[in-house]
């Protein structure tokens, strides 16, 4: 019985030693693995290469390609209506209309800015297309950055507006044209001037003036007749005197 108990105690001691050995091996392996991963991570973290990269940013990246280039069809001119015919108040037709456009972009070279003059049904905004009365392209430069469009003929009564179309390649964001302000021309009828009625006093003054003028006219005529008669008599006397002188000269000879 004592021997059996002693053997059991021995077996338990061996199991404890084996368990401790296994745990120490597992702990050592775990520590070694963690240390290896820690060294690799630290080396990888500190082993960093630096690169200097310059990035080019476009001012207008929404309307340019990857190289910051605009559409080649557009010369980067940028025209907007800055002035027009002032029709505030009453402007009588017929009347010629104009608009001035200012270029806030690059120089206008090849882009075609088209314009139309519309006769509108009303001036409510947004303006709607009406009958196209005249059209053309912006070309008349009147200043460093100013261009003028105008009608060739005078317009009849109605509501008018210029419509300027943006050229091909222009970054329009959906808006491909610009309207001027509506211009209203009125129909003005000229009233004939009514002659002033003469009063009795005006008639009396006119008659008195006429009567005064008659004697003066008669006196002038009589004076002129007397002068003519005297001139004729003088000429006659001179003629007779001349004839007598000739006769006396002949007698002396």
Swiss-Prot record:
Residue numbers spanned by region Important for TasA fiber formation: 50-57
Null allele phenotype: Mutation impairs colony surface architecture. Mutant produces fewer and altered amyloid fibers.
Keyword Signal set for record: yes
Primary localization class, coarse: secreted
Keyword Manganese: no
Ranges annotated as biased composition (Basic and acidic residues): 190-241
Function: Required for biofilm formation. Required for the proper anchoring and polymerization of TasA amyloid fibers at the cell surface. Is also a minor component of TasA fibers.
NCBIfam families the UniProt entry points to: cognate_SipW, YqxM_for_SipW
Name of the featured protein: TasA anchoring/assembly protein
Naturally occurring in which organism (per UniProt): Bacillus subtilis (strain 168)
């Amino acid at each position: 019985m004592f021997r059996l108990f002693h053997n059991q105690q021995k077996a338990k001691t061996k199991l404890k030693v084996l368990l401790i050995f296994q745990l120490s091996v597992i702990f050592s392996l775990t520590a070694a693995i963690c240390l290896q991963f820690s060294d690799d991570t630290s080396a990888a973290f500190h082993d960093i290469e630096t690169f200097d990269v310059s990035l080019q940013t476009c001012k207008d990246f929404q309307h340019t390609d990857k190289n910051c280039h605009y559409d080649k069809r557009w010369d980067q001119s940028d025209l907007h209506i800055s002035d027009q015919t002032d029709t505030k108040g009453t402007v009588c037709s017929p009347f010629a209309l104009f608009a001035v456009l200012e270029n806030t972009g690059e120089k206008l070279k090849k882009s075609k800015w088209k314009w139309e003059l519309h006769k509108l049904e009303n001036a409510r905004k947004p303006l709607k297309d009406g009958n196209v009365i005249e059209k053309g392209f912006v070309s008349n430069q009147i200043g460093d950055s100013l261009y003028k469009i105008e009608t060739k003929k005078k317009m009849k009564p109605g509501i008018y507006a210029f419509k300027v179309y943006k050229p091909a390649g222009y970054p329009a964001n959906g808006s491909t044209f610009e309207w001027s302000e509506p211009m209203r021309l009125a129909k003005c009828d000229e009233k004939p001037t009514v002659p002033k009625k003469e009063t009795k006093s005006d008639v009396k003054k006119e008659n008195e003036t006429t009567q005064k003028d008659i004697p003066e006219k008669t006196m002038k005529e009589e004076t002129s007749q007397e002068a003519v008669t005297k001139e004729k008599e003088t000429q006659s006397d001179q003629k007779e005197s001349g004839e007598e002188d000739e006769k006396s000269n002949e007698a002396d000879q």
